[in-house]
Each structure stands twice: as C-alpha cells, then as structure tokens.
Amino acid sequence: MIKILGEGKGKEILKSLSEKLDEIVKKEIGNVNTNVILVSKDQIKEMNREFRGEDFPTDVLTFPLFEEVYGEIYICPEVVEENAKEYNNTFEKELIEVVIHGILHLAGYDHEFEDKNAKEMFEKQHIYVEEVWNEWRSSLSGGTGQEGT
C-alpha cells in the first residue's frame, strides 16, 4: 500500500493516483508498504549530500528499507516543477515520471550504468508513465482522456 506523506504541490495528484501506483508496486515488488514523501528543496539537497555525496537538490531519492515499510521515495515538487519546464513537460506528468522512477528503483532497477537493466528500467518507466498519465487525464475529464494535455 502506498502512503503519500509530507506537504507540497502534487500531493492531491499523487493521492488520486495511489491505487494505480499501488498496482505498479504490487506488480514490480509485491504486496508491500511504500511511502512517498514530499519534501522541500532544502531537505532533499541535504539528503542528497548526506546519502549520495552530491551537493545539489534532486527530484527524487529512493531508500529501500525492507521492513514494515518496504521503502521510501522522497520527491521534491520544486525540482520536479523546474525539470518539467526544462523538459517542456507538465508538472503533473513529470511528477508521475519521478514517482514511477522511484518505484522502479525500489524494485531493484538501476541506471547508473548503460546496460540491459537500465534499458529495461526506462522502457518500463515509459510504459507505466503513459498508463498512469492516461488514467489521470481520463479521471479529470470524466473518462474521455482529453483533459490535462
């Protein structure tokens, strides 16, 4: 089961998609508890420095815990919004992109090296993002899928 914690832009979007995101977690990992935590730019920068040795804010950090809560996905809506503008994307689609990315990291996928695992990760990410994005747009328009484009 996915829990959406913290505060920030996108929380309601993620809550509305929690069932669909939970389906992806179950498919990729199993029936586990996962937290998606929205944090500020300062918080994620500090976490990135502490855990990765990188002194800049990032959009998503994933931490497997393998306990009652299987893992936590930290998302910084401010960086997501900046990335959306940079990549000519909507905030909503970029948010879906990073949460799916985090789920796949929890499932054991990695992209640090250009290998089969990275290729498979990004292929799955693309499929899941389109699936979730289309479902979200459809929910906005009463089932026609025409809103939010």
From Swiss-Prot:
Entries under InterPro entries matching the protein: MetalPrtase_cat_dom_sf_prd, YbeY, YbeY_CS
Primary location recorded for the protein, binned into one broad class: cytoplasm
Cofactor note: Binds 1 zinc ion.
Pfam families the record matches: YbeY
Keywords: Cytoplasm, Endonuclease, Hydrolase, Metal-binding, Nuclease, Ribosome biogenesis, rRNA processing, Zinc
Residues binding Zn(2+): 101, 105, 111
Purpose of the protein: Single strand-specific metallo-endoribonuclease involved in late-stage 70S ribosome quality control and in maturation of the 3' terminus of the 16S rRNA.
Name assigned to this protein: Endoribonuclease YbeY
Protein's gene: ybeY
